[in-house]
Amino acid sequence: MLLSRKLLNTLFPIFNKVSNQELETMLNSIGVEVENIIKFPRTENLIVGEIKKVEKHPNADKLNICEVFFENKIHVIICGAQNVRPGLKVIVAKVGTKMLDGRLIEAKDLLGVKSNGMICAYAELTTKTDVCSYDEIENIIELDNDAKLNDIDPLKYIGLDDEILDLSVPSNRNELNGVIPIAYDLISLYFPKSKIDFSLKNIENQKKTSIKINIDKELCRFFGVIDVSNVEIKTSNWKIKSFLLNCGITPINTIVDITNLNAIITSVPCHAYDKDKLGKEIAVSLNAHKEKFLALNDKEYVVENKSAVSVISNNKIVSLASVIGSKENSISNSTKNVLFEIGNFDNMAIRDASNKLGIKTNASTLGSKTIPLWITYKSFDYLIGLLKDLNIKVSSVNYVGDKLKDNLIDFDSQTIQDLLGQKTDVEKNLKLMGFNFVGKKVKAPVYREDLENISDLVEELTKKINVNNLELKPIESSFVDFEFDNFEENWNFLEKYFINKGFTLVKTLNLTSLENNKAFNLFGSKKSIKIMNPISSEREYFRNNLIQQHLEVLSNNYAHKINLYNIFEIQGLNYDGLWNKHLCLTLPIEHFNNKINNSKIVIDLLFIKSILTDLFNVFNIPFEIKAIENLSNDIEFISTNNGFEIYVKNKLIGIASQISPEILNKYKLDSSKPIYFVELIINDLLDSKISKSITVSDEKKEHNIARSITLSLDRNQNYKKIESVLDNYKNNLNLLDKFEIESVFIKDNKPSYTFSLEINPSKLNKKETNEINEIVERLIKDLINEGAEIKR
């Protein structure tokens, strides 16, 4: 699904102050993944002008001499578009404008007449022309009347100031292909004090149309028609056209565009007929006999007997329900009276008809999955209101449908808390999310047919538990009463901390397969929690780790030739009856550290140790590093010889390692390039007080560079010689601000020492990574000469 930020903000102004990053996090929390954010390239030096006069060019039949008024004077511009006429407000590229295709607009002579600028067509201002009609490509833009003369930001009038989110929607939430259902979910979760209006006011008190409706209730849960008379078929205004173009739909005319816009907003397919070509009765059933059908795509299909849910009038198929309409009954320039249709049809029958006939449309994609009945009623109601807003008079309506019923779910607070693994006021939180209580049952929001049992309620509460504080208003209450005084503050601090260090924040899904939980069971989880109605076997258990889905993220990006980044995630995971908070860093590339002259740092365990040293120092928590010894034999993705375990108070809280090449091959990543990760259980960090006064901001300053060196000695080796080498570097090189033993551990009867050092970049000559590495390599060489074995 393509979600227009501008459309979302227009319909629900509460999202105006939500950034794209915040919105992405919010969408992830309801199971919607943001695949990409599309921003339109901008052409500068544009202005809104008004055509005052048009004359034919004396030396060219297809060119027009236009007098265009802007900046308080008339400018002569030669234009070949056939729709130029006096009174139009247009977008002008002034002399000196560089167009997206590289052309430079110059004042030049065209067959004896000097042209001073260019009047723009839509296709000249965007790189996304695949859904443009002839009008957007060949004709100049005819701006709506509200465009202001001399406005130097005219792109907003044609939607090119929009941002488009390419979304992947859960298969069991088909309604989330509409703007309204997405907004309902987000508002109930993030803006609990903002009331959602679930009324269907527009349906009420409408005159009933004379057209009779008969439906097969096994195939159709709702069928409604809206009768509109004396319409004018013309090009839509730019408010409608821009939303369609930005969502990948070609504008056609006012009526057809309204049906497509309504589907974008509500997720329900909509169709329009030339009413004068229909009979006085409409039926919905399987087609009664074999029939040839000329569709809107100008292709003829043979519809076999009883093979497709059909809308029938005058004993003919007038549309294949939620697939495609007939050419014979379609809207044309001569249409005067229109009948709009919205239905809720059997999704399996829609899918079968679409597959058998080989017809794939936006409608069939939506119709082949379940759409909640209330959403269909809402779509019908919204369409009536939309027509009124566009000054299109509704003559009458008629509909037949199943009665809307409350979705009541058995409720047990203690069972829910046991599944959550955390104490919380379940009833209060569910009420804030739009649920109500009827006796011992909980009533789901009217549009949530997908919720069936306690496990579904747990999943809804889990979304809120995993919601990070985005500091959005009017959020004033927390859904979960965390025991940690510093929890939210520290969680937010950690996100900003790692973003400031050059990592990219990701959010991944909380459900996975049992196989993945076993293969990536870093911390010896004994019990994976299974949900009762999983979408698939790949998403039926709460996960016990983050790294597995990080590999999926990298694999997906690599397959689509998207640049890889060093990523991190902070998330709560539900396993072993506890709610454990995890932090995972995954590092597939050299780390870009623009604090020091755009240098790059090679990723290895030394770098990870330096990151951990900084992190734990911030929280004043001592930690210890040990060799990897406690992993299950099922954990094959870790290179045990190139990794370590992290302990706090003798308790394993983390693992850092290179990922094995075999696993990289499995995920179709480049196994010739090492990928490292570190995953921590950060309950203690979130419960701690930050010990240092640290400000995390976007400002890039020079910070000390941390490095760690681990060496081991035989029992009979003289540590004094090693100490003298270290003292020499510590005392004689004034660029070291810190040099101390970080940890000591024993493996294979050999003592191992980890030293941490901090280099002050302001004392370097070239301030380059090479100089830093040379110092470290020189130190390592001297240590090796004294018999030390360096752990790389």
From Swiss-Prot:
Example GO BP: phenylalanyl-tRNA aminoacylation
State the UniProt keywords alphabetically. Answer: Aminoacyl-tRNA synthetase, ATP-binding, Cytoplasm, Ligase, Magnesium, Metal-binding, Nucleotide-binding, Protein biosynthesis, RNA-binding, tRNA-binding
Top-rank taxon of the source lineage equals Bacteria
What is this enzyme's class at the first EC digit? ligase
GO MF terms, alphabetically ordered: ATP binding; magnesium ion binding; phenylalanine-tRNA ligase activity; tRNA binding
Q: Where is the B5 domain?
A: 404-472
Q: Where in the cell is it found?
A: Cytoplasm
Query: What are the annotated GO cellular component locations?
Result: phenylalanine-tRNA ligase complex
Q: Which residues form the tRNA-binding domain?
A: 40-156
SUPFAM superfamilies (UniProt xref)? Class II aaRS and biotin synthetases, Nucleic acid-binding proteins, PheT/TilS domain, Putative DNA-binding domain
User: What does it catalyze?
Assistant: tRNA(Phe) + L-phenylalanine + ATP = L-phenylalanyl-tRNA(Phe) + AMP + diphosphate + H(+)
Q: What is its EC number?
A: 6.1.1.20
User: Principal place where this protein is found?
Assistant: cytoplasm
Membrane spanning residue stretches = none
Cofactor(s) in the UniProt record? Mg(2+)
Binding residue positions for Mg(2+): D450, D456, E459, E460
Instruction: Show which residues constitute the signal peptide.
Output: none
What does the record say about how the cofactor binds?
Binds 2 magnesium ions per tetramer.
Its assembly, as annotated, is: Tetramer of two alpha and two beta subunits.
Q: Which PANTHER family does the annotation name?
A: PHENYLALANINE--TRNA LIGASE BETA SUBUNIT, PHENYLALANYL-TRNA SYNTHETASE BETA CHAIN AND LEUCINE-RICH REPEAT-CONTAINING PROTEIN 47
Q: Which family does it belong to?
A: Belongs to the phenylalanyl-tRNA synthetase beta subunit family. Type 1 subfamily.
Q: What is this protein called?
A: Phenylalanine--tRNA ligase beta subunit
Organism from which the protein derives = Malacoplasma penetrans (strain HF-2)
Lineage of the source organism?
A: Bacteria, Bacillati, Mycoplasmatota, Mycoplasmoidales, Mycoplasmoidaceae
